[in-house]
Amino acid sequence: MRALRLHAPAPVETRPLVLENVPDLTPGPGQILVKVSACGICRTDLHVVEGELPVVRPLVIPGHQVAGTVVGAGTGAEALLGRRVGIGWLHRTCGSCRFCVGGRENLCDAPEFTGWTVDGGFATSILADADFVYELPDGFSDVVAAPLLCAGIIGYRALRLTGLAGRPSGFRGARLGLYGFGAAGHIAIQIARARGADVYVMTRDRERHQALAEELGAAWVGGARDIPPSKLDAAIIFAPAGELIPAGLAALDKGGTLVLGGIHMSDSPPIPYELLYQERVVRSVANNTRNDGREFLAEAARIPVTTHVRTFGLEEANDALIALKTDAIRGAGVLVVA
């Protein structure tokens, strides 16, 4: 099989991912072997490649938004043979810690993550735990489905953590802010608008991100540091920029919630207490549960969500990550593998 391996973390401009021939994979008990068709690129992949997330697995193969077909199965996983499946960030959890037992497996004490602690989908094949994959809805091709498997699922969980669903009217009529409008943002706006929210988008790049936000029905679009015209009931920061936290808090109405949607984010500057006062809340998103993924994919199929993608070949992965780093991708980037 062919795979892109990271020999040592380095700026992506130095092209640290190397396409190599590596031994073929054999699934063990409870595992499946997936022929990769497409793999989305994510800012977390960039954090792995450039070393902002520490090296856990030497020569790791990145990639955690994988769509493909099951071509092999270990004992106990044979029922998935021939199925189209999606593989996300959460590779496996321990199942026995107090967080797993309590229904919060996203906070597992001993998790494994696709493309970071175990090999991911920047390859022609991948192994996955059969209990942690998703069956893909028929309405989505593999290329279109790939960004749903992290950007979509994390966006869905971030929307849940806003607490807007708990309002008497739910999302209907709520004012939601989105800071950053890449892969996750352009999916989250579709879910929020389908639920009836008015979405205010603060993001860079007029030609790409702001224009796409307008196409997808944002109530208002401005620059990353612009102040929205109305106080927000909740906001999500998808950009990995901690310096946006004070601005996000300042944009909230009383009792509002600011959700930090990234696995990695730069440090926040000091936050004046007056920005937190009147019961404003800041909370982070930590991974996702399998139920998040199942519920999101079902809702995405009902709406239906449309992913806007820019495709690259497997051998172009370094170029794809450079494009992601420089905000040159409108919507989501996807490696087409087969």
Where are these regions (language model features)?
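C-terminal hydrophobic helical "lid"/dimerization subdomain
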Residues: 1-3, 290-338
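Glycine-rich beta-strand-centered segment in the early N-terminal region that forms part
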Residues: 23-39, 52-98, 137-139
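Mid-domain Rossmann-like dinucleotide-binding core that forms the NAD(H)/NADP(H) cofactor-binding site
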Residues: 82, 140-225
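NAD(P)H dinucleotide-binding glycine-rich loop of Rossmann-like/cofactor-binding domains
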Residues: 93-179
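Glycine-rich cofactor phosphate-binding loops and adjacent beta1-alpha1 units
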Residues: 164-175, 200, 210-281
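N-terminal Rossmann-fold cofactor-binding loop
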Residues: 202-206, 238, 286
